[in-house]
Amino acid sequence: GKNKAIYQNETVGNAGWAILNGTGDTLTVVFDVPTTHVYANSGHLGPHHGNQANTWHGIGGTIDPGTTFTAHSGGCVECHMGPESGHSFNAVEGNCQVTGCHSSSKQDYMDGVFDRMQVIGAALDAAHAIHLDDPTGDYAYGNVHPLYGSHDRDTFNAMWNFLVILEDRSMGAHNPTYIQALLTEIESLLGI
């Protein structure tokens, strides 16, 4: 009948690629994307949430498998997931059995990640791969979204890795080795 949904591509269903046509017309949209490119078909494109766990284990980016951060074998979890803080990951000093974790050198490292994310974010924005919703915001903590479009694979992979770091929100603290590798990979892919 008239209200019956018609999928132009039955094999993928309503997965973003399909054309849902509830009018009964036979309208068709064809995306002719060369094999050298990837089509971004959602403003929610990117790694699925759980990025802190993925970063922790060194997975999720285009350089899998990464390196599991050795500090995770004890210290961080002891302080951040102790019985007093519940599952909030807010540090409670009473849990802490380790010293020197959040020294000025750690903050300097995180500031460096932040600075690199600004340069990378601006390059991806200029390539129309992402968009920063608030022009007064920043690319590390701002409201950043992927843009619809056909992107060459290097730009797409750079965007994906950028989103892994962005959604982790730790500026590298969850796995410095892996985040450095992702940043270096992104810069190489974008030529910056």
Language model: regions and residue ranges:
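C-type cytochrome heme-c attachment and multiheme electron-transfer modules
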Residues: 1-192
